[in-house]
């Protein structure tokens, strides 16, 4: 029969605290209660003194390491909270809320500046704010604070006010995306190999982020055609540093300061590359309902393909996708303007098209202003500066009742443009905005754009609406009409080259994005449509529409059918077609499917098998026909701790054999340590996890779990900026002989930050031991046993027995009571085979004086009579057992 007495004794201190306070203890409760110590079954004549705890809500003066919960939301870190006795009534105790802790509450400025402090400014004076409740929940090691919303800054679920934003720690980052492909032609025997990549290296120093982007391409082709005048080997290689830049957050302004090479991201004007500086309201700092629209890129790959997203020659995103429809939705809302999409198929075909990212109506909360100020010199590809000095500014002012007034100006010596617009929040009907932009251009010589002065106007209307009840969103960001003589800054810069053919010259642009899920009907619809008309050339129309239906057929559950129609046009070439897919479950984590692709002169049909091995790994196999030839392809993807790995292989009868590899990852190094990791957002925000040196600890945060390396470090990448991110240890997958006493952390990080959070993890065996002092007695009840890392690994019972975690051969530990280490124990090496047979451990005193256990610390909860002052800090009392 198991002996439960040891368990009872180990939790006895907290049983007393909970019985005394009813789990939750008000710091300034008034009612008194009485205790009968006879309910405690203790051995011998152990003394119990509960008179100090007869006041409801009383917490013994001392230091407690607690998780602070503000309005049911935990703050990012645990805090050492001091309790001090009341000056007028020592039977009451109060929590010392330091200025650093109060700063995390997100109080309004007028509330924070009127707060009063006690203990020489070290503690918030209690009772100042009406309706505030502060309670101690010792069972959960928590300080629970309730603050009326009227005292707090604007908040949103999972979004924190600026007072809680974390700039992270200093460090070095190096992120990369590498794609390698090899191809062998069956006819002629030609071979081609290509390696392409892009990435970001950078340094974080305090709030500053310094970055450099690179991109590279290597191609090697070997022809076996003796009649080919270009036969033989051909090698092309290129390496470029595409961009140097730096930025930092300005939390007090809810803005971002950027320096170096940049792309003008404007809510009013068309963008272009420049070198200079800007200060702008950062939409990422705004609550989610006020942020911009993140680009959504969709397409259809006929075979396994490499998809490259670029802007003005700079690669923004590159990945490998399997055959079929794809959507890229993780670019972030900081990317705007015209994006160029290039899809390189394994069969050698290339699709290219441009998309114009939709823009949300430029609205602002009433009484607030959003703005952008920029200046510098325009820049061509390759860091070449062109044109003269320019400057510009734009702003949106929330007037009242949902109305916003916005406008801006941009120009240099020979080009000026100005815009004025108005927006309206229609509440349940969405939001709409209308603006007019006028441009004046002075051309000094004959160009493709003409000569002399040109004046023109451009008119734009935008609309956006979320249908929360229907899980859908429609964003309509065009109609835009431009007069023939209207010029953007980019067109003006092109006009400086007299030999250049005129670009742009837009007439009309329509852009619509619609996404809706009819949950009850099991139907989802997605539409992305763009149409451009021009004054001097043919129009272009691009669209992608997906219709999916999920249904059951008899005993077969969760079947699906989807239909995709698409058209992409670029450089007078159009690719259009239709893709159909029917899938059904096959076991718990697998599906079988039929896929057909018809159009653009290439028809194909395949039967596929998809299987998800675990949360991090899946693969896909397809066999079918393409152009009346047999085709076989496979695709494998793994989200590893060190990198995201994608593998592909393709065989097309009589035409080609190919294989591909894609790696996306990075390295992060700080003074706290570092790790290799996977990533998709180059140079983006990340969270460095420290598991106290314990390897193979599974950490869940963003996507599949990552595991700590041999140094106990891991990186959770691609975390959201200015969002409350959470990471936690998967306790079900912890290594054997590892325990986590703290398994959840959270952080709200500024853009590009390297956050740092530490888990309390103990590694080693478990043992039941008995501690004895030199005089044969034992340490007092409630004494703590700590290892050399200051981790509490055990709590002494009333007979000196202790349950130890994290036991290692020959390890040194110390025993603490009254906040002081009194004696040391050394574990045997090797450890005995049976660690639960009452291992006797002598506790050797520290210094020349043997430890003495005085009577006044024998009570279950030690009485401490000293009053806390800033110069005489309270004795430490652990609250984590």
Curated annotation (Swiss-Prot):
Signal sequence range: 1-29
Disulphide bond pairs: none
GO biological process, one term: pilus assembly
Domain of life according to the entry: Bacteria
Gene3D superfamilies linked to this entry: 2.60.40.2070, 2.60.40.3110, 3.10.20.410, Outer membrane usher protein FimD, plug domain (2.60.40.2610)
Membrane topology recorded in Swiss-Prot or TrEMBL: Multi-pass membrane protein
Subcellular location: Cell outer membrane
GO MF: fimbrial usher porin activity
Entry annotated with the keyword Cell inner membrane: no
GO cellular component: cell outer membrane
Keywords: Cell outer membrane, Fimbrium biogenesis, Membrane, Signal, Transmembrane, Transmembrane beta strand, Transport
Primary location recorded for the protein, binned into one broad class: membrane
InterPro entries named in the record: Fimb_usher, Fimbrial_membr_usher_CS, FimD_plug_dom, PapC-like_C, PapC-like_C_sf, PapC_N, PapC_N_sf
Disruption outcome: Deletion of the operon under classical laboratory conditions does not result in any major effect on E.coli capacity to form biofilms compared with the wild-type strain.
Keyword Iron: no
Induction remark: Expression is negatively regulated by H-NS and subjected to cAMP receptor protein (CRP)-mediated catabolite repression.
Reported function: Part of the yfcOPQRSUV fimbrial operon. Could contribute to adhesion to various surfaces in specific environmental niches. Increases adhesion to eukaryotic T24 bladder epithelial cells in the absence of fim genes. Probably involved in the export and assembly of fimbrial subunits across the outer membrane.
Family: Belongs to the fimbrial export usher family.
Remarks, miscellaneous: The operon is cryptic under classical laboratory conditions, but is functional when constitutively expressed.
Protein name: Putative outer membrane usher protein YfcU
Organism expressing this protein natively: Escherichia coli (strain K12)
């Amino acid at each position: 029969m198991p002996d439960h007495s040891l368990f009872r004794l180990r939790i006895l201190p907290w049983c007393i605290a909970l019985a005394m306070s009813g789990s939750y203890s008000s710091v300034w409760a008034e009612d008194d209660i009485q205790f009968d110590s006879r309910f405690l079954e203790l051995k011998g004549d152990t003394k119990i003194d509960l008179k100090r705890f007869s006041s409801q809500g009383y917490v013994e003066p001392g230091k407690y390491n607690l998780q602070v919960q503000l309005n049911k939301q935990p703050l990012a870190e645990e805090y050492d909270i001091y309790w001090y006795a009341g000056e007028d009534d020592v039977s009451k105790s109060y929590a010392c809320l330091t200025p650093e802790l109060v700063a995390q509450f997100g109080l309004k400025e007028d509330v924070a500046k009127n707060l009063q402090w006690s203990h020489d400014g070290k503690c918030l004076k209690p009772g100042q704010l009406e309706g505030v409740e502060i309670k101690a929940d010792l069972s959960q090691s928590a300080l629970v604070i309730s603050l009326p919303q009227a005292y707090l800054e604007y908040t949103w679920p999972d979004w924190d006010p600026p007072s809680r934003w974390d700039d992270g720690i200093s460090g070095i980052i190096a992120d990369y995306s590498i794609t390698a492909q090899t191809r062998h032609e069956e006819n002629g025997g030609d071979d081609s190999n290509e390696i392409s990549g892009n990435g970001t290296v950078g340094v974080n120093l305090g709030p500053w982020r310094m970055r450099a982007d690179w991109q590279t391409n290597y191609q090697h082709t070997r022809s076996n055609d003796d009649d080919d005048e270009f036969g033989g080997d051909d090698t092309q290689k290129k390496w470029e540093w595409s961009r140097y830049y730096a930025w930092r957050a300005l939390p007090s302004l809810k803005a971002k300061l950027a320096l170096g090479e940049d792309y003008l991201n404007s809510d009013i004007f068309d963008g272009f590359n420049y070198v200079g500086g800007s200060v702008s309201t950062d939409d990422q700092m705004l609550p989610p309902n006020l942020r911009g629209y993140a680009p959504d890129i969709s397409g259809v790959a006929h075979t396994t393909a490499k998809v490259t997203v670029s802007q003005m020659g700079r690669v923004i995103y590159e990945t490998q996708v399997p055959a079929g429809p794809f959507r890229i939705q993780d670019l972030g809302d900081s990317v705007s303007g015209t994006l160029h999409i290039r899809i390189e198929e394994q069969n050698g075909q290339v699709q290219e098209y441009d998309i114009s990212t939709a823009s949300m109506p430029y609205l602002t909360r009433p009484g607030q202003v959003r703005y952008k100020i920029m200046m510098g010199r325009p820049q061509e590809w390759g860091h070449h500066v062109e044109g003269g000095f320019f400057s510009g500014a734009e702003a949106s002012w929330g007037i009242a009742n949902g109305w916003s007034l916005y406008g801006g100006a941009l120009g240099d010596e020979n080009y000026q443009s100005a815009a004025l617009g108005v927006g309206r929040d229609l509440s349940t009907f969405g939001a709409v905005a209308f603006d007019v932009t006028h441009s004046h251009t002075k051309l000094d010589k004959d160009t493709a754009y003409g000569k002399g002065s040109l004046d023109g106007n451009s008119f734009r209307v935008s609309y956006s609406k979320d249908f929360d009840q229907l899980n859908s969103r429609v964003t309509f960001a065009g109609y835009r009409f431009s007069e023939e003589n209207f010029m953007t800054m980019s067109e003006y810069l092109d006009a400086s080259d007299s030999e250049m053919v005129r670009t742009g010259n837009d007439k009309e642009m329509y852009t619509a994005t619609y996404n809706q899920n009819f949950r009850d009907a099991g139907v989802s619809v997605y539409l992305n449509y763009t149409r451009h008309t021009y004054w001097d050339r043919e129009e272009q129309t691009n669209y992608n529409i997906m219709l999916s239906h999920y249904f059951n057929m008899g005993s077969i559950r969760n079947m699906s059918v989807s239909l995709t129609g698409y058209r992409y046009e670029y450089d007078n070439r159009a690719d259009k077609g239709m893709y159909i897919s029917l899938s059904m479950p096959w076991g718990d984590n697998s599906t079988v499917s039929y896929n057909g692709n018809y159009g653009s002169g290439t028809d194909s049909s395949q039967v596929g098998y998809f299987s998800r091995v675990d949360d991090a790994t899946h693969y896909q196999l397809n066999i079918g026909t393409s152009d009346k030839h047999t085709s076989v392809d496979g695709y494998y993807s793994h989200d590893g701790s060190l990198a995201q790995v994608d593998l592909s292989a393709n065989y097309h009868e009589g035409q080609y054999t190919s294989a591909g590899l894609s790696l996306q990852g990075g390295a992060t190094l700080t003074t706290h340590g570092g790790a290799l990791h996977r990533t998709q957002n180059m140079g983006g925000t990340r969270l460095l996890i420290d598991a106290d040196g314990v390897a193979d600890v599974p950490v869940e945060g963003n996507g599949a779990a990552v595991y700590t390396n041999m140094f106990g470090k891991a990186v959770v990448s691609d975390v959201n900026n200015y969002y409350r991110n959470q990471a936690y240890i998967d306790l079900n997958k912890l290594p054997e002989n590892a325990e986590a006493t703290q398994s959840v952390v959270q952080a709200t990080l500024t853009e590009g930050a390297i956050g740092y959070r530490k888990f309390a993890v103990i590694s080693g065996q478990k043992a039941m031991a008995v501690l004895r002092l030199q005089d044969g007695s034992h340490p007092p009840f409630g004494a703590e046993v700590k290892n050399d890392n200051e981790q509490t690994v055990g709590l002494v019972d009333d007979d000196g027995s202790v349950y130890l975690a994290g036991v290692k051969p020959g390890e040194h530990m110390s025993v603490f009571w009254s906040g002081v280490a009194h004696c040391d124990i050394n574990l045997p090496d090797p450890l005995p085979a049976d660690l639960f047979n009452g291992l006797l451990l002598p506790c050797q005193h520290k210094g020349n004086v043997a430890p003495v256990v005085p009577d006044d610390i024998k009570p279950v909860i030690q009485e401490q009579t000293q009053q806390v002052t800033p110069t005489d800090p309270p004795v430490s009392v652990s609250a984590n057992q």
